[in-house]
Amino acid sequence: MSTLSSMYKPVQLPIKYSTASPSLRRSARNQYISEQKGLCAHCNTPLSVIPQHLIDEFPINSSLFPKGMFDYAIHLHHCHDTDLTIGAVHCQCNAILWQYFNE
């Protein structure tokens, strides 16, 4: 039986987000998910469920985000100052981090 950690080649984290290929971003996201034991790096709840408690506390204005922003449930969060990845987060947490905390 294959586990998530055996399905991708480990990468040296963090990675530079803007210069990483889609496949490197995917590998990094998968590695973060594994290292975070399936929990969101922001809200610490399982990445398999929508973080409704945060959405209720911080309503998301979807018009602020590009089309397709919410097409993928798990995002690779990165620092906009250093361009280095931080961890895997819910797409909603990524939106909240940007909209409310300029991350």
Enumerate the language-model features and the residues they cover.
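Short intrinsically disordered terminal tails
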Residues: 1-3
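Short, charged surface segments at domain edges that flank catalytic/cofactor-binding sites
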Residues: 6-39
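General structural signal for secondary-structure boundaries
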Residues: 22-26, 90, 101-103
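Histidine-centered nuclease catalytic patch
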Residues: 42-89, 97, 101
